[in-house]
Structure formats: C-alpha cells, structure tokens
A protein has these predicted regions:
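Active-site hotspot residues in diverse enzymes, especially metal/ion-binding acidic/histidine motifs
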Residues: 1-191
Length: 191
C-alpha cells in the first residue's frame, strides 16, 4: 500500500476508534503521559520512552494552535516510531528526516479534515488563508494537499513540503506563545 494512503487510513481509523481528533485526548487514551517542559526552551515538543513509560513533553509557552500541532506531531511518532527516542546521533539523518515527515503527515491528516481543506482550496483561498481558517500552520496545509494529490485527488498546484519545518520554529519566539506569557518577566520561572 502506498505510504500516503496508509497514513491517511491509519489516522482515519484512529479518529473513528477514539471518537476525536484532539491529539491530547488521544495521547492520554494511548497511555502516554503529556507534560509541559518545566523550563523555558526553544524545543517545541518531544516524544520519549523511559523504561517502557511513554511521555510527550511540550513547550509550556505555546499557544493552543501550536500546542495542538506539536501534540499531533508527537502522536505521529508514538504511532509509528516506537524507537524514535532511541535514535543515536550516529544514525542516518535521512531516517530521522523521513520519520519527521511521517509525523508531519500524520499531524496534517489528524488536524485537517479532507473535506474542509478541499472546500476552502476550491473556493480560491490561498494556503495562508486556509491555514488561518483551520487553525494550523501553512506548512501542514501544504503537506495535506500534497498527500491528497499523491492519493489521486485532482488538486491543481505544487505544494512545497518541508519535513523539518517544526525544527525551524523556536519555542522562545513570542509569536508562538500563548498570550498569558507574552508580557511575563523572562527571569521568572514557575516550577
């Protein structure tokens, strides 16, 4: 089966099974502990396994849109990459890049309903407008549309795919923060 179709079908089966698209609820249902990082960091999120116990950590300052995307991405790692957290730096970067792309495809299918993105795209909205309407980043819209094309949907256009776009988003950039953190004293940490 084509990888694009497999991920799409896996996500839809998961949504059907869980009765939700909410990545936080699904992670909890899958017995993954979801916690914010205790300190400020540029890292958006991380999936790890510690002695058989699965964790997702996320940047505590993220706004809800970004947090949802990060949790959906980390859920993709939980679903497909059980050994992801164990990859050593000596391993191939292409394997890591491929796993990042799979997690992004998973997140795009989880957070974006096919009928919603197709309807908005056919109405003539551009990627940035669609992303705004759907509360995701444009990169996820590009991934979703590209994957739908690969599955045979007739969609005009070329969609640039960045497998590592999350890596380029810094958790310490205020534009990604929840408004409660924007004017906080940067020297204050609530542990």
């Amino acid at each position: 089966m084509q990888k694009s179709r497999m991920i799409y079908e896996d996500v839809n089966a998961l949504i059907e099974q869980e009765g939700t698209r909410d990545p936080h609820d699904i992670l909890i249902s899958r017995k993954v502990t979801v916690l914010p990082f205790r300190m400020d960091t540029n890292i958006l999120g991380m999936y790890t396994d510690v002695v058989g116990k699965k964790f997702v950590f996320y940047n505590r300052r993220l706004d809800e849109t970004m947090k949802r995307m990060v949790l959906a991405h980390e859920l993709g790692h939980n679903f497909y990459h059980y050994d992801y957290a164990d990859l050593s730096t000596a391993e191939s970067m292409s394997k890591k890049s491929n796993e990042e792309l799979e997690a992004n495809i998973f997140a795009a299918h989880l957070l974006i309903k096919t009928e919603d993105i197709l309807s908005l795209y056919e109405e003539g909205y551009d990627i940035n407008e669609i992303a705004s309407f759907l509360y995701v980043r444009p990169e996820l819209c590009n991934i979703k549309l590209s994957e739908l094309q690969k599955m045979g949907y007739k969609i005009a256009g070329n969609f640039s795919i960045q497998s590592d776009f999350f890596k380029n988003i810094k958790g310490m950039d205020e534009e990604n923060w929840d408004s409660e953190f924007v004017h906080e004293d940067p020297d204050f940490f609530d542990f």
